[in-house]
Amino acid sequence: MFGGKVKFSGRVFVKICGITNETDGRIAMEAGADALGFNLVPHSKRYIDIHAAKDWIAKLPEEMCRVAVVADANWEDVCRIGRLPFVDALQLHGSEPPEFCRRLADAGIPFAKAVPVSGSKSLASLPNYFTDTMILDSSENGEFGGTGKTFPWKFAPEFVRHHRGINVILAGGLDPRNVSEAVKLVRPRGVDVTTGVEASPGRKDANLVRAFVEAARQPFGSVQ
């Protein structure tokens, strides 16, 4: 549920996350990314104040999906952010329970739910999060997302096969060198990257961004 701007069909969907400035946003857009992620989690190295950044985010081309990443924020703040005119969708990247997600779906706010993957059991008994878009990400020493570490991809293909109604986005330690292999193995609808295309935390490397987008779409050309 990334909103009407995203159609999960055809080529591999690519989201570049941890965007902190307009220049990096345009680099990702020109490289062919489908979505940009803005981290609103206060302790993150890539945190931005969404209101301070609203002018340059709003100036990004309308065809680009703008995703606000939140984690365990309170209900009022999540709804307020999700209804901002320059935010197209939310990404819940904390331990938000299914009931919270159900309320968000009932409110008509587009969102994706990220879940940590550490083994087969972490995917075997996932509850209903009331969204058609889920992000499988790695967890390292209690830190979830933006770790630069992969999780064992062998656990993901079965989940993708058994959840055809879910748009699965693969994240966690992806970079231009491994994303092609990951897409071949897992067959996700999309991929999400932060650390793997950075020159430093919060600053993107244009060459890495371009290489990542190209490599992500190389294996099949399209996703069935």
Which residue ranges define each predicted feature?
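Conserved N-terminal beta1-alpha1 strand-loop-helix module at the mouth
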Residues: 1-224
